[in-house]
Amino acid sequence: PQGVVVMHPATGVPQRIYQAFAKFLAERGFHTITYDYRGIGASRPKSLRRFAARMRDWALLDAEGVMRWARARYPELSQLAVGHSVGGHAIGLCSADWDVAGVVQVACHTGNSRFIRQRGERWRVELILRGVGPLMARLIGYVPGKRLGLGEDLPGGVAIEWGAWAGMQRYFFDDPTLGAIERFNRVTHPVLVYGFDDDPWATPAAINALTMHFTNTWVERRQIAPAQAGGAVGHMGFFRAQFAATLWPGLVDWLSERAAATRAEAVAA
């Protein structure tokens, strides 16, 4: 095997959505691990009402736990990670990333609606994140995300913290209880960042507002137009099988290069 890749999902997106991509990686020599955050998909309890979970728990407990498990299970292999949207946040926030050879961030950005160009979409996102979502979380104990276009239903605590961060100028970097700036400063592994011209949320400015905090590592940016991809990608499309021939090979090549570099460093040592 070339290495092991942990796939960190987006908000409200169950791991099954990444099945085709995980299979693609596995066929090219990577052990690939997918998982669900607490309260989502296979990690959802029978009832989400008053289920205790915050968005930071997805990063500091779930993402970190899976990455540490991968390291313990495959100690001889290069450790790599792919993060989709909030999955990229999780990698930057958790501590286990110190042992990672490289990370790919796909459509990862700060969740500030001010970066959304379309006025109608900006208002819709603000209404959901800072209004309807937190209100429903407090009233019924969870957020019916499927009805609001947020993917899966969300634990109430996740929605409340998400809404609070969305109201901060620098998103969670302004939350003094999280220490996000210090956490991102600790990242020293190379980072590859994908953005898409037709993504209404992860605009170049929103991506920059996140990646600027990787101050101690090398960040490579790839901004893709629909014509280059062979179709509309948006915020959620990268992991669809239709892009297996156009978008996925470049990502896999980068992971392979990072895995090879890590093996070479180990031999030299």
Task: Identify the residue ranges that each predicted region occupies.
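Catalytic active-site module of serine/aspartate enzymes centered on a nucleophile-bearing elbow/loop
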Residues: 223-269
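Alpha/beta-hydrolase active-site loop
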Residues: 52-73
